Structure formats: C-alpha cells, structure tokens
Amino acid sequence: MGNQMSVPQRVEDQENEPEAETYQDNASALNGVPVVVSTHTVQHLEEVDLGISVKTDNVATSSPETTEISAVADANGKNLGKEAKPEAPAAKSRFFLMLSRPVPGRTGDQAADSSLGSVKLDVSSNKAPANKDPSESWTLPVAAGPGQDTDKTPGHAPAQDKVLSAARDPTLLPPETGGAGGEAPSKPKDSSFFDKFFKLDKGQEKVPGDSQQEAKRAEHQDKVDEVPGLSGQSDDVPAGKDIVDGKEKEGQELGTADCSVPGDPEGLETAKDDSQAAAIAENNNSIMSFFKTLVSPNKAETKKDPEDTGAEKSPTTSADLKSDKANFTSQETQGAGKNSKGCNPSGHTQSVTTPEPAKEGTKEKSGPTSLPLGKLFWKKSVKEDSVPTGAEENVVCESPVEIIKSKEVESALQTVDLNEGDAAPEPTEAKLKREESKPRTSLMAFLRQMSVKGDGGITHSEEINGKDSSCQTSDSTEKTITPPEPEPTGAPQKGKEGSSKDKKSAAEMNKQKSNKQEAKEPAQCTEQATVDTNSLQNGDKLQKRPEKRQQSLGGFFKGLGPKRMLDAQVQTDPVSIGPVGKSK
C-alpha cells in the first residue's frame, strides 16, 4: 500500500520538520496508541474501537513503521489540533486510524477524512498519497477537498480539520514533501487519479451517499472494525505492491469503507463492464464463429461429400436442399417432368447423378445465405435422419412409394455403375454396406430423398405430376428394363464400358441439370451423343459418387436386396446399351 511508501517519506519529512516536532511526534507515536484511544474516546467512542483496531493493524504491519506513521500523523494531528483545537484530538485519532493506513501525506485530508477514516481506513491509506499530494500542493488540497468533501459532507470536524490541515499542511508538508514526498505523491496521484477517475465515473453518485453512510458507519464500530481489519491487511502489503494495491484497494477499500460492499459493487461494476465487454466480444466472436462454423462445415462437407458418405453430408445437403428446394422444384418440375417422361433410364440417371453436383452448388449457395436456417435444418435433418426411412419418406417426400420406386431405379443405376466394375462381388458388398451403413443409410436415404426432390429427381417431378404418374413411371422403367434380366452375364462386360459411359452420360446430365434447360428430352439424346467427350472428364467423379449412393441406398434397400440387384442388372443393360451401342 502507500503505507510503506509514505512511511519513509514520513521519516524524511519528519527529518525535514523541526526535530522538536518529530520528538513530539515520536512521543505521541509511542504514546500515540493509548493517546489515540483516548482521543477517540473523547470524540467518538465508536472511533475509539476503530483506533484500537487500527493500532492493532499498525502493530501487525510493523511497529516501527506504525510508530513513525503515528509520529508523523501525530505531528500532523497536533498541527491540526492547534488550529482545530477541540477537534484536533479527533483529527489525531482519525489520523492515527488514517496512519494505520499511511496517511502522513494526507494529514490535512485525513483530518477531513478521519471521520471517513474510521470507515475509509484502507481508503485513506490508499488515498492518503492521493490526498497527500493535494495537501502538499496548496491547489491540490482544494481539489482533494471537493473530492473528499463528499466524504466530509457528514459535517464532522474533519472537514474543518481538513481545511485547517490543508492550510497547515502546506507549511508542514512542503518540507515533508521536499524530499521523497514529491516523488512518492506523484505515484499516489496516479493511483488516486485512476481511482478517482474510475470512481468519478462509477462512484460519483455513490460517493456522496457513501460518505454519509460512512459517517454513520464510522459511528458503527462493527463496520469500522471490519474496515480497520482491511486497513491492517493493506498495511501488511509490501511496499512494492503499495501503489498497485493502493489502486486496487482504493477501489475495493473505499467500497469496503462505504459498506465493504459499495466498493465491491464498483469493482463488480468494473468487472461487470469488463465482463460485459468481454461477453460482447465473446458474443461477437461466438456469432462470428457460429457463422464461420456454419459456413465452414458446409464448405468442408462439400469437400468431404465426394470423399465421405458419412452422415455429415446428409444434414448440410438436406438443409441446403430444403432452403434451395423451392428454386430447384420450380425449374426442375419442368425439366424433370420431361425427363421422367422421356428416356426413363437416362432420366433416372439424371436424377441420380445430378444430386451431388447440385448439392455442392446448393451448399455453396445456401451455406452463406441460409446459415441460421441451415443450422436449424441441419439439426432437424439429423433428427429426421434418425427417423426410420419410411418416416423420412413420409416427412420429406409426400409420396414414399414414389421415392422407393424411383430410388430403386436410382439404386439400380448406382449399382450398375459399381456392378459393372465389380460384377458379381457387388451383392455381397452391397449387403455388407447395407449393414455397415445402417446409421448412414437413413441419412443418405434422406439425402437421396432431398436430392431427388431438390435436384429435380424423378420423384419430385413425378410428385408434381402426380403420385400415380411417379409410380407408373418408376414401374414402367422397371418393367421395361426387366426383359433384359436374362442378360446379367453379359452385363458386366457391357457394364464396364457402359458404366463409364453411364457415368459420363450422368455427368452430362448433371451439367445439363445445372443448366436446368437442357434436361429436356432432346437434351437426353444430345447427352448420349456427347457422352464420349465428357466420359474422360466426368467419369472419375461419377465413379466415386455412385459408390456413395450405393452405400446410402444399400441400407435403404435392406429388404429390397434381391430386387435391388435385379434392378441393377436390369437397368445396367438398357442404360449401358445406349452409349455402348453408340461407342460401338
């Protein structure tokens, strides 16, 4: 605290002062403890206890320093006592209390604060240097006066003592401050300045009321005893920490003097302000991070989608597709309706293959635009994903039958891509994938539903055209494809050639779907024509995508395994036949 800092200054000040006074001060310091008690008893019985507690605190800090402080305080107190004769002992006693918190520089102010001193024991010790400077510099006492007049408002003699001590102290303190006093006060000034600054900001309104309360609390020994205890602790603080502690404790101790709470409220207010500022910053950061997380997951998942068939894909895509569903539906209803009525296998390949590029586009689009909605739908989609596929179909797709059939066709095409490459082992792999992808199946099935809808899949267009039409179209595709079922053996051979071409044609359809205008019947023919050129470019991407779809749909068609394979083989031939024939 400022105590140790002020104590050496006091010693130097005492040396600067007449030695007779220092002797008297020392004598009063030695006798000061009992004398202070008596003075307090004379003026304020309540302050007597304060004086005792302060003495105990002073003794706890360091008897020599306390004696020196008391000597200085007594000298100042005596000087104050000379001018404020009746109240001088009170000033001394209060000074002593103040001295317990090194008040030597603030003698004048402390005299005024002595009333507050009982309450503001720690405050006086911390502010002692701050007020000390005012008392030392004539003009500052005036400044200190108004600052502490609020504390002195109770009208105790300390106000007069402060004025007299301010008048006296300029004479007494100049020699005292002549040495290190001038330097140390500057530090207290800084501390007191910051303290007053923050207090004026936060405690101006509190200070007058607190000063009145302090006057009352000075009358209450319990509260005063608590304050001296704080002051004693502040006295115990090392000199190195005096200034910093003075700043912190002045804020806290003044609060404790005010009620040991008001200061804390100030500290709490500061802490609250800081916490609020931090909370605002954190909120901003959290908001930014929230958007970042919303944006980055979508983007990251768009990257992951071609690689991972995990559930991450489903939530974002489902949310994105939901947000962008309206955009796709209106356009895709036109193109998809035509596609579903055109070459069904190629149309199915469109609906199957297009979803992922469209998903990526929708992710990028809806990611930034529909971040909060994406998050909400993301969570909802996850929840819906946990729902059985049938329920998902009911929820997401108005006609689950349409989706099932269309997905059977889709799965057939997808399995065609891999079956063409994998030939026979696909059934077993599909079963294993079904079992493994059970958790993912619902998610992927949900994605399929959303992708079929959002990307203008046959199901969505057929839903618009009518549930019956969807059932008919899907059934017609399956039935029309069924005749070549006896050709499964030749399918792998053609499939290998046709798979790449199917994928290529699917890629073509993806591009045309993105254009959303070329997805018409003539577009399908042109797609098959341009399959060869695009096959090299889009073949690889499509190879990965059908694998994902297989896994996702594999779990979805657990009960449809044999049917799924039949559809795959059945669709393989017609789908592959077109491009294969052209390639031939």
UniProtKB/Swiss-Prot annotation:
Gene name for this UniProt entry: BCAS1
InterPro entries assigned: NABC1
Record GO biological process: myelination
Subunit structure as annotated in this protein's UniProt entry: Homodimer. Interacts with DYNLL1 and DYNLL2.
Biased composition (Basic and acidic residues): 186-226, 238-252, 300-311, 357-366, 428-439, 494-506, 541-550
Name this protein carries in UniProt: Breast carcinoma-amplified sequence 1
UniProt-annotated stretches for the region Disordered: 1-29, 59-280, 297-377, 415-584
Taxonomic placement: Eukaryota, Metazoa, Chordata, Craniata, Vertebrata
UniProt note on tissues of expression: Highly expressed in the brain and, more specifically, in oligodendrocytes (at protein level). Expressed in the prostate, and at lower levels in testis, intestine and colon. Overexpressed in most breast cancer cell lines and down-regulated in some colorectal tumors.
Residue numbers carrying Phosphoserine: S124, S192, S314, S381, S399, S552
Location(s), subcellular: Cytoplasm
GO cellular component: cytoplasm; extracellular exosome
Main function: Required for myelination.
Composition bias, Polar residues: 59-69, 112-128, 314-354, 525-540
Modified residue annotations for Phosphothreonine: T480
Region annotated Interacts with DYNLL1 and DYNLL2, chain positions: 565-584
Coiled-coil stretches: none
Keywords: Cytoplasm, Phosphoprotein
